[in-house]
């Protein structure tokens, strides 16, 4: 923004008429004057003729895309999500098949005398209690430091390390098995780590941050729009439309990656979850992009309305005159974000598809249909 307001004007002023040099002659024939967007005009005319129907259909489509979000599950990805043709992944599959739980066991660090009879008894009780749960825990192994003051207990967990089976086994270990065995040792302190524990704890930390970030971003965006346009309706509607865009993008990501609908096309193995950091990342980035489009379009609509146009004419003028810019920017971003879907890393695929889908949805369904339809319906309330 600083560069656009300072460096860009200075450079353009310095260049003067020379900025026109280097134009490609043939491309000038395809340019159309502002306000003559025929494609968006064909879309916009029926929307403004039947705003209630258009708004209903657009909302229904966004809600349908967002429905998978209700089943969103987050977990860290691992080598198992990468293409099976990679030698490392093949080796990991063989290890997991031959030694279930060994590639990603739970590791318990225990601060106690590891040579004591009480400690050895507690470890034996832990093994018996783990076997009694019938959850598929593996055989326990124990080692300690040279001074025998800190022990390390390794116990293989069932599942692939990030699925529900592994998570439930981890919670049982932390909440029931360890307190009933190791936790009874006098003066003992212990903690559970390992790949599954790291993934679970990171996931829980991200979940706890979501409400705070959501509340701050929504409130901040609402207040900025309220200050800019002096309208509660415009500010509230912008927040709602942006939330619909984000929810629809979440739904696409969940369907493609968590449900595994895109496995064959994008060449990955679903772990039944999406990356823990992705919901927060997508929300912040997409809300900013959506708000940018929204303010850009509304500014043109307001300018037209202030010049004496009716609400319907101002909306049509604002959409048509900004459609080319919004569409071009959206296509560039969709193309750039889609590149991430070609990478072998699952998190990058999720980010690319999520961003590309959200920008495409926002620039078409939301800005070209839902926004003008709701503005026409609200009339002077805008």
Where are these regions (language model features)?
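Structured non-transmembrane domains adjacent to transmembrane bundles in polytopic membrane proteins
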Residues: 71-263, 295, 347
């Amino acid at each position: 923004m600083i560069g656009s307001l300072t460096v860009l004007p200075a450079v353009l002023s310095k260049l003067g008429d020379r900025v026109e040099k280097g134009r490609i002659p043939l491309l000038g024939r395809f340019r159309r004057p502002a306000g003559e967007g025929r494609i968006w005009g064909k879309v916009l005319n029926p929307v403004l003729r039947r705003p209630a129907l258009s708004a209903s259909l657009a909302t229904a489509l966004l809600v349908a895309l967002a429905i998978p979000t209700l089943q969103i599950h987050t977990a860290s990805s691992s080598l198992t999500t990468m293409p099976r043709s990679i030698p490392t992944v093949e080796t990991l599959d063989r290890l997991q098949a031959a030694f279930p739980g060994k590639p990603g066991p739970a590791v318990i660090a225990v601060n106690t005398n590891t040579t004591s009879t009480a400690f050895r008894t507690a470890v034996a009780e832990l093994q018996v209690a783990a076997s009694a749960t019938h959850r598929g825990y593996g055989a326990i192994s124990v080692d300690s430091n040279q001074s025998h003051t800190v022990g390390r207990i390794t116990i293989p967990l069932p599942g692939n390390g990030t699925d529900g089976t592994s998570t439930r086994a981890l919670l049982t270990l932390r909440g029931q098995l360890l307190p009933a065995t190791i936790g009874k040792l006098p003066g003992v302190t212990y903690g559970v780590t390992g790949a599954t524990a790291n993934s679970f704890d990171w996931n829980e930390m991200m979940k706890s941050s979501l409400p705070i970030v959501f509340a701050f971003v929504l409130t901040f965006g609402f207040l900025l729009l309220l200050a800019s346009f002096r309208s509660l309706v415009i500010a509230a509607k912008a927040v709602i439309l942006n939330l619909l865009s984000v929810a629809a993008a979440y739904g696409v990501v969940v369907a493609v990656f968590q449900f595994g609908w895109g496995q064959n096309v994008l060449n990955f193995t679903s772990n039944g979850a999406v990356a823990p950091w992705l919901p927060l990342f997508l929300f912040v980035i997409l809300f900013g992009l959506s708000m940018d489009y929204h303010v850009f379009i509304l500014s043109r609509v307001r300018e037209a309305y202030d010049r004496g146009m009716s609400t319907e004419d101002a909306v049509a003028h604002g959409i048509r005159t900004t459609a080319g810019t919004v569409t071009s920017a959206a296509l560039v971003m969709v193309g750039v974000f889609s590149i991430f879907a070609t990478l072998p890393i699952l998190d990058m695929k999720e980010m690319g598809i999520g961003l590309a889908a959200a920008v495409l949805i926002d620039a078409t369904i939301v800005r070209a249909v839902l926004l003008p339809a709701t503005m026409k319906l609200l009339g002077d309330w805008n």
